[in-house]
């Protein structure tokens, strides 16, 4: 395809390349021939089983490559575990320090994350107790062979039986020859070449004394050079070799040496000597020799197995607002302002007994020395035998000092005799730095994601800027600004600041002014400090944006709650108005409504009493209309003095509309009968309820009032029809007075709700006719009066 080589041309090209480079690579021809044979394998041989099957090999290779990361890690951990087991067995078999071991004894099965090289060095220097073998049980009455069996991990024999493997003979007395041989061995072990005075020791030890071997061989790279002979180097090369040799020379650590093997101490086996006064570790509850570590603060015993398990906690956010106290002493002051922003911390390990920080221990070695030791160095520190002793022993193989009495004061964590937990784990600072960097990367990535989402939501059209997330989660600009529209750059200051922080390269097609182009920062360099500064600025702007957003959300929430409260109050007011309207329509308090009858409303004349003692309604107050009698038309009524405004009653046809006339005369003023009003109100309320049950659909939808209006004309017609056959049996009182007075005007107006405040106008129908036509048989002994709750009820014109 295109310019690529085809399959037929590849072997020729590779053949030409191999011939062209034959002088430089003598193995190229062989590789080419092997590749040709592998590519040109005969299929017939593979069928016969002679040639190899490529498919099977490919499948095996793919299966081998399908190993997951967890499987690789598990296989690696298993390999390391097997190597540790072998190394532990070898060390316990060949190495020891004063009867103790340099490897753990399996008291704790967790991960050994302490620095084993440092622990080994401290134990060989007798500054830290070795890993003694712990005893599950101990008795002061045990004999020597029982102590030996317990120390070697063998079954404890009876006191009077000595197993063959525990038999021992007393050490032979030292003769003169043995003394001389021992002295020569000691001198041989203690003789150390002085490497600080001369640099020729390393070269003499690494090269042979034969001068011919010091010459370069013909096959060496020096001999292949054609510029000059190796014996005549230039001055620059000589100076360079001397300089590099000084800088590249590794300072060799202290050289380990094995002391003469002596299994006895003061004529006793070393195990019996160590464990005859065993003491218990207060943490693991195992019995060890009395030569244990002592805490620097409270002088409590602790074995090395427990000591190496105590460490700083894992990196975590600071608690209770404490300052970061995990920085080294020399750099703590400089890092204090930087650690006040809630970074991860690792508090120093505390003492398990007195909970004092900066946990450390001291060690007083036994009075003898066996096993491994370091060759003496005149420049090395003196070997202190106890923390409270100022004497030192430089070359004594058997110091006669014994552990001193218990300290009365605590030692400082910076004391040279104190071994702290940070000493055996020097990588805690790097671990903390890595955790902080990881947390910072995650925080920056999250901030970048939030910022990107904010910018995308703020600019839904997406025509001003295009952003994408980079490898580390930091936003990078993926392209130039689309189009030359400069108005798309306008936005909130926070949006512009965030865009400035996330876009460090100037736009190519932007139409901004030259000043804005000049104010943009230069392209981002590969400097970590610049990235950190940008991330800090971005995080600050994000915090400001979140604060503004939270304030806006709080304001909207308050407005929403205020609207909800207002709506609730309005709803409650509507409910109260509706309840008041219901109580006004069907007056539950008949006496109150009857006692407060306005003087402007008409009354229905009772058939059982005279109206001479009651006050007539004045014609000048309110707008009263006469209801039309169904039996007699309004124009034939002798009491109708003149025509007034026509009143349109809902439910009536236009041909049935009649004119209403005001009252022609008023009755003389007299004391009103309140008891009659009460009786009339109660009688009319029962009448209205009975009529509402018989005629539920009397009101039409054309009325402006929400309450139903009764068609009083139809009601009067029904009453009139019922009265016609029973007119002869009707009992009438005061007939003469009623005839002399003539037919009075009857005014009936429906009651309206007091909650309307007099704003609703309810149409009223004036009915004029004889008293006999208006009063049915059922109400012959009752007085009926229509009262309204509103004082300003007006008839619609």
UniProtKB/Swiss-Prot annotation:
Residues 27-37, 53-76, 174-183, 314-323, 551-580, 726-736 have a biased composition (Basic and acidic residues). Belongs to the SIP5 family. InterPro entries: Sip5/DA2. It comes from Aspergillus terreus (strain NIH 2624 / FGSC A1156). Residues 210-231, 662-678, 737-752 have a biased composition (Polar residues). Residues 196-209, 383-401, 679-690 have a biased composition (Low complexity). The keyword Membrane does not apply. Keywords: Cytoplasm. The keyword Cytoplasm applies. May negatively regulate the snf1 kinase. GO terms for cellular component: cytoplasm. This is Protein sip5. Disulfide bonds: none annotated. It is found in: Cytoplasm. Residues 1-76, 153-231, 243-262, 314-340, 383-409, 506-531, 546-759 are annotated as: Disordered.
